[in-house]
């Protein structure tokens, strides 16, 4: 993932900062992980994975 792109991308729901981990962009506040496919972030809520509380604590 391009570092410059990561600096300008925000969560589409809360506009918070995202973390890049293992082909996903993660919003800790909303507990959502947005997939990155072929280096293209998919920033759609319906495509995001809900992060379980146990996993959120490890981020």
Swiss-Prot record:
InterPro entries: Trm112-like. One of its GO terms (cellular component) is cytosol. PANTHER family: PROTEIN PREY, MITOCHONDRIAL, ZGC:162634. Belongs to the UPF0434 family. HAMAP family: UPF0434. This is UPF0434 protein lpl1884. It comes from Legionella pneumophila (strain Lens).
């Amino acid at each position: 993932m391009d570092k410059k792109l990561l600096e300008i991308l925000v969560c589409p729901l809360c506009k918070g900062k995202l973390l890049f981990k293992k082909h996903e962009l993660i919003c800790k506040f909303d507990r959502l992980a947005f997939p990155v496919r072929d280096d293209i972030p998919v920033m759609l809520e319906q495509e995001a994975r809900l992060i379980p509380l146990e996993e959120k604590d490890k981020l």
